[in-house]
């Protein structure tokens, strides 16, 4: 297994205003994204114990996103996984949660 650390933030202003409950939408999207990231990273041979996504309803108290692996090539692969998974999870979320 390749070592990996991923810390991502979902901010309320990035969710958009079309949801009736922005906080519920943010929490649901963060949960979906974390699950999909763990799945995709695990399939690529990364340890998934240190992957987390946190929703923040305000800009206070959040840190910058962080993607780290113990080798440069692995880190580049992990960054690609994060980018692709973030996009596909957002599409999946929007298509399946139009009632939030």
Give the ranges of each region predicted by the language model.
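Short, flexible N-terminal segments of the mature chain
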Residues: 19-43
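Polar/charged, Gly/Pro-rich intrinsically disordered segments
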Residues: 47-100
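Arginine residue identity/basic-tract feature
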Residues: 7, 36, 83-86
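Short, extreme N-terminal segment that most often corresponds to the first beta-strand
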Residues: 1-19
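Intrinsic disorder/low-complexity segments
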Residues: 4-5, 31, 61, 70
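Short coil/turn segments at secondary-structure junctions
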Residues: 16-21, 69, 73
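Low-complexity, compositionally biased segments
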Residues: 16, 24-26, 83, 87
């Amino acid at each position: 297994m390749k070592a990996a650390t991923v810390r991502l933030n979902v901010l309320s202003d990035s969710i958009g205003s079309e949801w009736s409950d922005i906080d519920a939408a943010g929490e649901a999207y963060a949960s979906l994204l974390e699950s999909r990231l763990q799945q995709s990273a695990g399939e690529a041979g990364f340890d998934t114990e240190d992957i987390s996504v946190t929703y923040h309803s305000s800009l206070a108290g959040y840190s910058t996103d962080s993607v780290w692996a113990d080798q440069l090539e692995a880190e580049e692969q992990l960054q690609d996984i994060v980018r692709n998974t973030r996009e596909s999870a957002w599409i999946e979320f929007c298509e399946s949660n139009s009632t939030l």
